[in-house]
Amino acid sequence: MNSERSDVTLYQPFLDYAIAYMRSRLDLEPYPIPTGFESNSAVVGKGKNQEEVVTTSYAFQTAKLRQIRAAHVQGGNSLQVLNFVIFPHLNYDLPFFGADLVTLPGGHLIALDMQPLFRDDSAYQAKYTEPILPIFHAHQQHLSWGGDFPEEAQPFFSPAFLWTRPQETAVVETQVFAAFKDYLKAYLDFVEQAEAVTDSQNLVAIKQAQLRYLRYRAEKDPARGMFKRFYGAEWTEEYIHGFLFDLERKLTVVK
């Protein structure tokens, strides 16, 4: 099932499901998207290969979740991207929810995880990683490991990191979609149970861990080159620092 029609809107069902499911479980409020970043488009290629690339942004917030945001890139059969990340408020020790769903001319790249604040803390792993390992193992049987990824990135991923490169679009539409649903459900279960942190030392550690993660993601964002090519360097850097990974900017404003 590798049809063009299927690929063109490959990740729209993921996005639609996530928003509807979150609405059913959370009291979602809009999160402000800076002017000029709600959507953008560019025409790339020439002649028969000409294609419009459209990037659309979505953002929400709740009492426990500082920013729930998605960047959806649609550029025809050979370019489909959904980057969907949930950032908790700084007074919760929740992990980040991260889904990177990417289709390029060379194939599909899928990354799903609950990215830990404190990866090497055994109590943190017991609280947030061990409960989801059965979900990881169940899906890993059908979604083989995607191969090496940068060593510098490893501290930001949990032992339940689902990283795979499916060959078939049908696998994305079925098994990857099922994994996405299960990970999101488990994450919202954690959110439901989460209690605010009040200890000042722990709050400092959470803030430092969040900033460490966001700085890494902003610096190493693999979409930077793609966005620069489509929309220019100025728009790209502002989109990355002012929307996709905006915590540092928000904290500066608060000061």
From Swiss-Prot:
One annotated GO biological process: phytochromobilin biosynthetic process
Domain of life: Bacteria
Reactions performed catalytically: (3Z)-phycoerythrobilin + oxidized 2[4Fe-4S]-[ferredoxin] = 15,16-dihydrobiliverdin + reduced 2[4Fe-4S]-[ferredoxin] + 2 H(+)
Keyword match Oxidoreductase: yes
First-tier enzyme category under EC: oxidoreductase
Oxidoreductase recorded as keyword: yes
Function statement: Catalyzes the two-electron reduction of the C2 and C3(1) diene system of 15,16-dihydrobiliverdin.
Family note: Belongs to the HY2 family.
Name assigned to this protein: Phycoerythrobilin:ferredoxin oxidoreductase
Organism from which the protein derives: Nostoc punctiforme (strain ATCC 29133 / PCC 73102)
